[in-house]
Amino acid sequence: MKAIIVLLMVVTSNADRICTGITSSNSPHVVKTATQGEVNVTGVIPLTTTPTKSHFANLKGTKTRGKLCPNCLNCTDLDVALARPMCVGTTPSAKASILHEVRPVTSGCFPIMHDRTKIRQLPNLLRGYENIRLSTQNVINAERAPGGPYRLGTSGSCPNVTSRDGFFATMAWAVPRDNKTATNPLTVEVPYICTKGEDQITVWGFHSDNKTQMKNLYGDSNPQKFTSSANGVTTHYVSQIGGFPNQTEDGGLPQSGRIVVDYMVQKPGKTGTIVYQRGVLLPQKVWCASGRSKVIKGSLPLIGEADCLHAKYGGLNKSKPYYTGEHAKAIGNCPIWVKTPLKLANGTKYRPPAKLLKER
């Protein structure tokens, strides 16, 4: 019987390699993993963005406050907070507020010695409330306050709506009418007059001048003592007589004297007290404030709308869940800050093409 021999032959082409797996090109995508370090993958989805600085904006779906009184033209927030004539208007409610005046300029009404008190904080205190309104009535009758009767002083730098001399609506400058003599400390009680259970912010202060003016106005050229007390907080002051710092930036008419302005916060139903001598600025209209508004440092104007307000970048729309760059306070629907970019691998781990078998 003849044997049948079958020969298996390998037929080769000009190439000496064949591919034994799926062909794959080199991958440019590298991700860091917790267990394997840097790994090449076939595809990624970026999860981070690096914002660029832009205008601040209104927070989407939320009332945003820029200036305390948007319709009060040529008025700083400090003017509005003190109710300077021509700077009294509607203060809209807001869930978010922009702190845009880090150092409010001095009101042109009268030179204020800012560094003696916390008065610079007043606009920001008001900005931190959702609802703020100025009372329609005065908290006390200043003309008949203890130590009076008083006439109410005005300033040519504070023209009112009729272009006559005026003064801040939150305070009454109590100048003795006839009894221009020194006085022992006097006490006035400041009642709570807000009607909706709000915090009551009561503004008060005192005027001081050189010895000649103090004698002419008040009959006493000595330093005067003042104390305020409310909500468990007591503050003491002694007035300065002359030797005031130059405040040419104040604007308005030149003034030989200065005023010191402060405020106290009265909780619902609580009475405050002010102990004073000559030159007192007695409280008049008060701020009634309620709710909370988130505050972020920024700049005006507010342009358009944004998902997020960021202290460094302004208004941001959330295109990615994370961001890199400068880390700062942000409010709203904001991406989360991360130190380095994050990527989501949406492909497979890159495997180089398998080595091809050579012909033996």
From Swiss-Prot:
GO CC field: host cell plasma membrane; membrane; viral envelope; virion membrane
Lineage top rank: taxon: Viruses
One record GO biological process: fusion of virus membrane with host plasma membrane
Keywords for this protein: Disulfide bond, Fusion of virus membrane with host endosomal membrane, Fusion of virus membrane with host membrane, Glycoprotein, Hemagglutinin, Host cell membrane, Host membrane, Host-virus interaction, Lipoprotein, Membrane, Palmitate, Signal, Transmembrane, Viral attachment to host cell, Viral envelope protein, Viral penetration into host cytoplasm, Virion, Virus entry into host cell
A GO MF label: host cell surface receptor binding
Free-text description of this protein's post-translational modifications in UniProt: In natural infection, inactive HA is matured into HA1 and HA2 outside the cell by one or more trypsin-like, arginine-specific endoprotease secreted by the bronchial epithelial cells. One identified protease that may be involved in this process is secreted in lungs by club cells.
Similarity comment: family membership: Belongs to the influenza viruses hemagglutinin family.
Name of this protein: Hemagglutinin
Organism listed in the record: Influenza B virus (strain B/Panama/45/1990)
